[in-house]
Structure formats: C-alpha cells, structure tokens
C-alpha cells in the first residue's frame, strides 16, 4: 500500500479547518476563611444567591452573602474537611431534597439522607426546598377539620386542614406531646405527617420515633431531624426541607398533609448565628432584619389548595418556646402574627395537673371554627366562654368573700369541666366520643358527681355507648351532626340513673 505524504497533509489540513473547539468555562473559587459552618470565598463572580456550591472536600454549601470581593457561604454538613485555600466550584442549581413514598417511616436529615440505619432511600423524585407559596387563586377556604383527638383543642380551638396553628409555651409544658397526639390521631385518615425536629437532643428525637412506632404512626410519617449536634446551617434549612417533602404529597398526590416544626425558636437562633457570623447587621434581640421573612415564607406554604389543583392541603403546627411565659418577645409575636391562631400552654396549669395545660383565655383559632363539625359546634358552643368565666370567678373566690348559690354552682360546674378536659398523653379520643362526653357535661349531667369521679363517669359512659349504642356513635361520625339531641339526652339520662 502506497501512502503519499501530500494526501496525509491534505486530510490533516481539512480536519484542522473544520475543527470547532467545544469547551465550557468553569468558575473556581478559593476558601479564604472557614469555621462554625461558614466559609468565606473569593472568586466565583457569577454565582447566584442560594446557588449550591461544591467544596474540594466533597461538602456542599449555599452561596448566602454576595459581596463585592467575597462570597459568604453556609456549609451543609461537615465543614471540618474544608481548609483555607480549598477549591470551590459552582453547581449551577438550587438545593433539592428527595421526596416520595420511599421516605415514609424513615428518619432523615434536612438533605434527605437517611440517619436511621435502615439503608438507602430509593427515589428519583426531588423538589426544591424553597418553593413559592400558593397564590390567592390557588387556594380555597379552610372548611374540613383536622381532628387532633384532644378534647380541649377539637372543642375550643379547632384546627382545619390547611390552617397554621401555633403551639406556644415554656419549656416542659407539653408542646411536643400535643403535636405527637395530633400525628397519632391521623391513623387511618390518609393524612401524611412530617415531624421536623430542630436543635433537639438526638436522644429526644429517638424517643419521638419510638413513640410513633409504638402507636403505629411511623408508617405514614417522615421524621426530619437536625439535632443539637448538627451545624447551624442544617438547623436553618430543616423546616424548608421538611416542607418540600410535605408539598410533594399535597401537589403531586393531592393528599392532606400535616407538618410539625419543633421548634422554630431554635431555627431562628440558628439563623441569627449564621447572620452574625456573616457580619449581617443585627436588629432587635440581635436577630437580623429579615427574621420575619424567615418564618413567613415557610408558614405561607401551608394551604388548602383549590379543586383545580387537586384539593390537597398542608396543615402546619409550628412550635415556639417562650422564656418565663413571655409571649410578647420578638419571635413569638412574629409567629403569632403569621399564623391563624395559637394554643397557649401555661406552666402554672401544667404544674397543677391540668394536662394539656391550655390557657383558654389567650388560645384562639381564627379559621378553624369554619371547619368545625356541626355536632361539635352544637355541644361546645359556649364552652370557651364558660371556662373563661370560671377562671375569673375562681380568682375572685380566692378572696374568701361569701358567694351566692348560682356562683357556687358555676364554680362547681367549671371545676368539673376542667377535670373532664384533662387527657392522658398519647390517648387521642375519636371525634364522635368527644361530642357525647362534652354534650353530657354541658347539659349538666356532671352537676351532682364528685370531681374525682368525673373521669370514671366519662369512661363508663363511653363503654356504655360502645357496647349498647354504637349505632349512635356511627351516626354522629358519618353525618358530622347530632340530628336527635333529645334522643341523646335521654340515652345519657338513662345511663346516669344506673351510674
């Protein structure tokens, strides 16, 4: 075979002539300072706010502060492998978390990585953690109840599907217990639950997971945990990650979802720490100026979607921890103004044995009343006012002034009502049974029963109804109404005569 040099040269010239360089320039930055979950970087002139960046160590971060010369980034996860001089590159995307049915029953960190030791989570579905809240046209009125199984809440401060109801109180007043009761009570209702633990001890989170497992609630629940041992950036993004997981079920599967943020005080503290480390100007209580937006953009994502979007819902129960019952502090007042009502737990009530320790006077539900069933409205209509007047009369009676018979009778009925509304932890009561019990109390059937026998009366009444009058309970549950008030009165009267 005879190959001529001129032919080779001609082929090479043709190839060179037609060659087009195809390359993508890649911006690279350098870490100049790192510590406490924060990295300061030079370079990356075109990086966007909240864009993901990749460190040489394999850690992922978010571009948080965009300054003239440097970028302030938060590191998501372990920042100990990042050193001064480490290379950083852009990922050109915003933070996403895995979502879907595969996460149900699992414990994950805010990035969706499993931390329960039960293997990898296999899902190809992902959602961005920062998603716009639905607009007015995409929502509909809250009109369907979300039963918590707690008598005091379902009767006086009812929660509707799509509502945001704040649980607020001092440390150790039973805030988490109320949230867990609400999750346990969703068994069999088709509601998907997400529990977001922010800044709690790992042992506390393990206890919560164990409680949910014991009550068969873990199978429809996702636990998102950013524990006290995790860095401030992870605690900051935890609620948004949990919300994205809940939104998948609301938007894609058209389901009702319930999310617990336990608690947003610790998230605000983590955000304050990040902001101060990044030299953002401090405001009231050293929080940055946009701390209101931190919570408003999260809680506005809770909604009851319009029928055109499938009619799914996201109900949010944020928890706020107060110091010495100080409800007028900065973060509590912010979240109170964002939410649709609050359940206020009082230390003095908790210590005196009233559990759940709900202060009826200051607790309110602004939209849940529209979602309350007709049956509960009929029996619990005056309950809040009666209990509030009982509290004021009780304070007045401490003075030792002689009281008339009517006032004494009101005090006696109020004390029995308070006793009736006490409830054991993790023992939610079905809605129809709550209706019967509260009906009996408001109609005066407890008047000649001693206070220490109120719970015995309640227990025996429910046993009697389940055994002999189950059809009445079924009717109330299906119709959400009491059609024959006189008939129910006679049934309880008949039971009372044998008690």
Curated annotation (Swiss-Prot):
The keyword Nucleus does not apply. InterPro entries: ATP_synth_asu-like_sf, ATP_synth_asu_C, ATP_synth_asu_C_sf, ATP_synth_F1_a_nt-bd_dom, ATP_synth_F1_asu, ATPase_a/bsu_AS, ATPase_F1/V1/A1_a/bsu_N, ATPase_F1/V1/A1_a/bsu_N_sf. The keyword Cell membrane applies. One of its GO terms (molecular function) is proton-transporting ATP synthase activity, rotational mechanism. Keywords: ATP synthesis, ATP-binding, Cell inner membrane, Cell membrane, CF(1), Hydrogen ion transport, Ion transport, Membrane, Nucleotide-binding, Translocase, Transport. Coiled coil: none annotated. ATP binds at residues 169-176. It is a peripheral membrane protein. The record marks 363 as: Required for activity. It catalyses: ATP + H2O + 4 H(+)(in) = ADP + phosphate + 5 H(+)(out). Its EC number is 7.1.2.2. It is found in: Cell inner membrane. Its main location: membrane. CDD domains: ATP-synt_F1_alpha_C, ATP-synt_F1_alpha_N, F1-ATPase_alpha_CD. Transmembrane segments: none annotated. GO terms for cellular component: plasma membrane; proton-transporting ATP synthase complex. Belongs to the ATPase alpha/beta chains family. Produces ATP from ADP in the presence of a proton gradient across the membrane. The alpha chain is a regulatory subunit. F-type ATPases have 2 components, CF(1) - the catalytic core - and CF(0) - the membrane proton channel. CF(1) has five subunits: alpha(3), beta(3), gamma(1), delta(1), epsilon(1). CF(0) has three main subunits: a(1), b(2) and c(9-12). The alpha and beta chains form an alternating ring which encloses part of the gamma chain. CF(1) is attached to CF(0) by a central stalk formed by the gamma and epsilon chains, while a peripheral stalk is formed by the delta and b chains. This is ATP synthase subunit alpha. It comes from Brachyspira hyodysenteriae (strain ATCC 49526 / WA1). The lineage of its organism: Bacteria, Pseudomonadati, Spirochaetota, Spirochaetia, Brachyspirales. The gene is atpA.
